[in-house]
Amino acid sequence: YLTGMRMGGQRVLILVDSSASMLGRTYANVVRYRAMPDERKVRAPKWRQTLGTVEWLTTQIQPGARFQIYAFNEQAATTVAGSDGGWITAKDGSDFDAALAGLRKIVPTKGTSLIKAFQAARAMKPTPDNIFLITDGLPTQGASAPAEPEPIRADRRANFLRQASAELPANVPVNVILLPMEGDPEAAIRFWDLAMRTRGSFLAPARDWP
């Protein structure tokens, strides 16, 4: 579903979920891919769609604008070494190529701490004027990972999203691109709500998009 995707911006931040769940659309697929070698993991259809989505977004950024790509699981970091907290000017295609090449080196793993991604967004100077969030469901942890793996109930995951949202920089639209995960029925409505509250947009694309 597409509700007026808000493109444009002079400081565009793309946040990419790189947790283990981005390997599959069902828990069974995630478990199967997690047992595979890394070179197979990065060819998982859902992760390839994620990479294609980021590449498509970069084609919408105007020359001269600034951008940044952060990948996040239990931590958040830029895909261009040494550029954390700063912006990259879109002078020519090589700027995007470097950021995308860094993203392609990432192998999805670990849990999802959305609060880390939103804290990174708030720490950027100057702050973003447009954020794109690519994820597949509600976060599985808050600011710190649990000492031992544990099942996380839906209400706790919703609370992790509320905690993360409180860290967002003020008055910045969040455009959510959701690649839904089986067994997380609340994700769509809660991320739609986040997008609407921030005057962003929400998209749950078909598997062959973009």
Regions found by a protein language model. Name each.
Residues 22-69, 85-95, 107:
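…and closely analogous acidic/polar surface helices at protein-protein or active-site interfaces
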